[in-house]
Amino acid sequence: MQESELLHNQLKVEELKKEEEIENNLEKKKTPGIDMKRVNLIKKRDEDIIAENIQGELKEEERENIKVKEKEIKEEKKEKENYPCMQIIDQEGIFADENQKERITFEEFIQENTKFKELGFNYNMLSILGPQNSGKSTLLNYLFDTDFTVLNEKNGRQRTTRGVWLGLVGDRKDIIIMDLEGSDGSIREDDLSFERKISLFSLSVCSVLMVNIWSHDVGRYGASNMSLLKNIFELNLQLFQKEDSPKTLILFVIRDRDQKKPFENTKSVLLEDIMKIWDNVARPECFKRAPIDKFFDLEFTSLPHFKHDKELFIQEVKELKKRFDCKNQNTYFRSIYNKEIPADGLALFTKQVWSSIKSNKDLDLPSQKEMLARFRCDELIENIFNEFEKEIEEIKIKHSEKHIFNNFKIFCDCLYDKKMKEFMNIASKYLDRVVKEKADLLSEKMLNEISYLFQTQMTLAINYIKTMLTTSYVTLKNQYITEQSSLFDPTKYAGYAEQMDDFNITIKNEWEKISTQSVPSNIENNFEIEINTLDRFINKLYEIGRRDLIEALMTHFKKHLQNIMKPLLLPLFEQSNKNMWEQVRKIVLETTSQNLQELENGMINSLKMNKDDVEKKLNELQVYIIDAVRSTILERPGFVSNLMENKFISIFRLDNEGLPKKWKQNEDLSKPYFKAKAEAEKILDLFSYIRMDPKDDNFSFISINPATGKKMIIEEPENGVIDQTKVLFSLSERLSIYEGFQNMAEANFMRAQQELAAITVHSKTPMWLILLIAFLSFDNIVYVLKSPTLLALTLIIIAIIYSLNKFGYAYLIDSVISFILSISWSSVLYLIQDLGLFKNLLPKPEAPKRKRPQKKIQDDKPKSPLLVTHKKLPSVMGDVTIDNIDSLNSFDDAFKLVGHDEKPIRKPFRPLPNRETQSMRNIPTSASFTKSQSMFIKRNITTASSLNKPNETKEF
């Protein structure tokens, strides 16, 4: 606009001068009779016009200065706001990659133009080359409405464009225009390296090269543009040596064309020069005979003089502008020229290309594109993955609170697909090979994170189901176990069965829902084993729960029977008659038949059992009846031992009236002893086996050893095969009971012998011996009689001895005397020494020396180093596996294997005492034993308790 205004003012001044010359000529031709007044007016008008012109020129300069300043301010403001154009490479060859105050970076320029970033490959780049001050910037400004700086002729011919300037134009801002520094500037002189570098740079990124040529340079081989063309050809061969490399369109714009000279002639001359240059260009061997159109498409156009034919220039530029519209069928921007550099990666690509060019490295565009693709993909991966991590933070927070994340699968699948789609939408513009590689990397990173969250999700889910199982089944079990303490009512078990069914359905549905919603589609389900295991574990626990509920009902029925039968059975057991088991069977049959229908109705109606299972359980009822009878016998500790002892004492120690027997002199004790012992042994045989079948009455567990003729306890009767469920006491328990009974019987027998011996000794003492003892001890008797103290003490001792002798405890006196005599002199010395008596007088006895066992000398073998073994982390299902689920028999086994930390609440119960130790504890203590007898009993009990091998017998 400035040039047009100046031109307009100059033309106006020239017109005024011409008018003045015309007026002067007319004045000379006029005759002397001319009106001078008119002449003076004309002169005055001319002077006013000249003054106005002078003043106008001054004002015009002021206006120009103001406009320049306003333009600078406007450009600065525009640069800061929209960055329509920028200097991408300055005159020193520095790329705009650092945020400097005087210019923005290329990356910022692209970031500000968000529409351009989204274009992908759908944009075009054009650069213009040519001599300095050849009107390149002016042409671009008129052609693309850019605002590049143009030459100010008042300042003389100088370098206007410095380095490389870039502008973003077009309705969609899809055209990038690069204005390159002139090729023959005086400042560079003979330094052609910068010219060559920016030419190579434009070839690397631009699909169209405009070569600005003056018309008078056409045909002159030494013109600067010819060397420029040579550079372009050589550099293009250097860059694009692959068969599939894109072509480049070179548009020759011939400026200031001669209107008198046909354009076709100019074109043919220029084309001839181009072919000469192409023939002389050094080419690789593979392209020695390659024509120029293999690499370039050549287009030619011309424009009139800008100053002399400005209107025509503007008109033809408008026509030329249509060829740069992509919608035009004859557009210069054809897809075959596209260098396929994504819009969002253009800044990085140009930076890398210029860095290689500037450092004089071999420029490998495929490698640069691959490098760009890798960098941009890595950048995308980092950004997308950071966003991905922010979005999954919601899951991590939920997991940290030990809560399951609902709809885990949908959330992860949608998030994964969303992020992969975002990546592919942006990265698909780059090299397919690199994009696929980086897409796999991003996918792997996200799936690793999802997999980790999936493991946490499944662990929490399985623990949640385990807690549900434990809470549900154990709580329910505690309820129906508590029910057993109340009256037997099978209808109450209906509610427990319904609750258990509801628990099972609820837990199954919850687990199916959680497991279905927790397995993302894109990861490998490494919890299949745990899922299948937990499925079977849930079914197994339901099976155990149903079985335990049925067992609880049967146990309740057993206790019910036991409570009914106990008052009837205990008198029979205490009497221990021969027909005891016959009477027991009668009572059991009557009691069972009265309550069996109630049990059957409870199993069918309350527990919803089918007829086959009910029939099976009723067939097993015999086991519960046997168990009830067994519980009645064993609930009293030492019941059988007491019966045997009472039976033995009632026969051996008591008479028919139940009073203690008084033995007669020389009475045979063996007959009542063996009789009482035989009767007591029958009780042991009677209670060895629960005889619920009449055939069982024929079984006997005491036999005679044919070799020795002594009785022995056998494990199984010789006349049949027994049912192990009916065995009341094992062989070792029977041996223990018999040992205790044997010791008790022997103690009573020894006591009876002592009583009988005392009677015999008392009756055999002669009278003369008594008189002789009295005569010899007369002095002592008199001394005692004179001393009241000794007399009283003597009478007391005599009374005690008399009482002991009368009641059969004379053997205690013998035991005391034996104990006193058994104390050695060394023991007395030890006692005195410990009490501190006669410390200075009595020597301290030597302690007996004990031989220490010599340690075995071990071979000096080198010790192997300790192996540090890492403990295997417990599985989320603990020790439960598919293989051992079927072996689970109880909730305790199941929860122990599954590794549940929360112990279910159970009511305390008293375990049944061990029968063997119980039998040993309950050895009859009605008789008093001496120390030696007690040691004898303990030794025999220990021996008996160690006899626990099958089919082992013991003779007595």
From Swiss-Prot:
Q: How does it sit in the membrane?
A: Multi-pass membrane protein
- Disulphide bridges, residue numbers: none
- Compartments (UniProt record): Endoplasmic reticulum membrane
Region described as Disordered: spans on this chain:
906-929
> What stretches pass through the bilayer?
765-785, 789-809
Q: Which residues form a coiled coil?
A: 8-84
Topological domain spans for side Cytoplasmic: 1-764, 810-956
Q: What is its EC number?
A: 3.6.5.-
Instruction: Give the enzyme's main class according to its UniProt record, as a single word.
Output: hydrolase
Q: Which ranges carry the GB1/RHD3-type G domain?
A: 120-358
Indicate the principal place this protein occupies in or around the cell.
Answer: endoplasmic reticulum
- The residues that hold GTP are 130-137
| GTP-binding in keyword set | yes
> Which is an annotated Pfam family here?
Sey1_3HB
Q: Where is the composition biased (Polar residues)?
A: 915-929
Top-rank taxon:
Eukaryota
Q: Output the GO biological process annotations, alphabetical, semicolon-separated.
A: endoplasmic reticulum membrane fusion
Asked if the record carries the keyword Nucleotide-binding, the reply is yes
State the UniProt keywords alphabetically. Coiled coil, Endoplasmic reticulum, GTP-binding, Hydrolase, Membrane, Nucleotide-binding, Transmembrane, Transmembrane helix
Q: Which residues lie on this side of the membrane: Lumenal?
A: 786-788
Which molecular function terms from Gene Ontology are attached? GTP binding; GTPase activity
Sorted alphabetically, the Gene Ontology cellular component annotations on this record are: endoplasmic reticulum membrane
| Record SUPFAM superfamilies | P-loop containing nucleoside triphosphate hydrolases (SSF52540)
Tell me its family. Belongs to the TRAFAC class dynamin-like GTPase superfamily. GB1/RHD3 GTPase family. RHD3 subfamily.
What is this protein's function per UniProt?
Answer: Probable GTP-binding protein that may be involved in cell development.
Q: What is this protein called?
A: Protein SEY1 homolog 1
Q: Which organism is it from?
A: Entamoeba dispar (strain ATCC PRA-260 / SAW760)
